[in-house]
């Protein structure tokens, strides 16, 4: 996964002018609910004010010592407690460590919309049909798509990966 957050353009600050780091006195928070220090279970959040976007919702395949366990999924507790702030789920590509827990997520948390590249969207739809989960709000994006919320704007950069239709996600916030 690649998350790119734009940096402050110091050239745009006039001489003698104080640099304003935080718009509206709100912090932008970027954190992982899975995927750090492990290969799998990728799930990241960007939060600004009352808006949260989620990036990926993957599974971790268990080690041999976890007998009887098929998948390890992220802890959705934070998302459940902040369900009203969720603007959408953004998928970078169709590997299971990035989409494998979507069916579990949708059964636990209200996700208003899933944004995914075409190939990943097809894989997600198949996964949901196989598990009898009805969900109709999957929006397909490409490198020309921009998604704008009140405080967050999301853009996409096509990347080369071992699966077609993979993207980096660019998140613009009032803080950069």
Q: What does each model-identified segment do?
A:
Residues 23-29, 149-154:
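Short Pro/Gly-enriched beta-strand edge/turn motifs at strand-loop
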Residues 119-166, 172-174:
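Metallo-beta-lactamase
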Residues 30, 56, 93-94, 154, ...:
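Divalent metal-coordination and catalytic microenvironments
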Residues 1-18:
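Short, Lys/Arg-enriched N-terminal segments with co-localized hydrophobic residues
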Residues 89-99, 159-163:
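Histidine-centered catalytic micro-motifs
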Residues 24, 36-40, 160-165:
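A short catalytic or substrate-binding loop motif that flags glycine-/basic-rich loops and adjacent residues
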Residues 36-41, 48-91, 103-112, 116-120, ...:
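Pre-active-site segment of Zn-dependent metallo-hydrolases
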Residues 45-50, 54, 166-176:
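Metal-dependent phosphodiesterase/nuclease catalytic metal-binding core
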């Amino acid at each position: 996964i690649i998350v790119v957050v734009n940096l402050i353009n110091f050239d745009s600050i006039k001489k003698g002018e104080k640099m304003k780091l935080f718009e509206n006195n709100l912090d932008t928070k970027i954190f992982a609910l899975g995927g750090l220090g492990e290969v799998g279970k990728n799930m990241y959040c960007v939060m600004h004010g009352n808006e949260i976007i989620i990036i990926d919702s993957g599974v971790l395949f268990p080690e041999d010592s976890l007998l009887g366990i098929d998948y390890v999924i992220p802890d959705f507790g934070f998302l459940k407690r902040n369900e009203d702030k969720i603007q959408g789920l953004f998928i970078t590509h169709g590997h299971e460590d990035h989409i494998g827990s979507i069916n579990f997520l949708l059964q636990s948390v209200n996700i208003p919309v899933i944004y995914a590249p075409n190939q990943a969207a097809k894989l997600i739809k198949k996964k949901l049909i196989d598990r009898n989960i009805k969900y109709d709000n999957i929006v397909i994006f490409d490198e020309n798509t921009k998604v704008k919320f009140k405080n967050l704007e999301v853009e996409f950069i096509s990347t080369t990966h071992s699966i077609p239709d993979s993207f980096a996600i660019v998140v613009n916030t009032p803080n950069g």
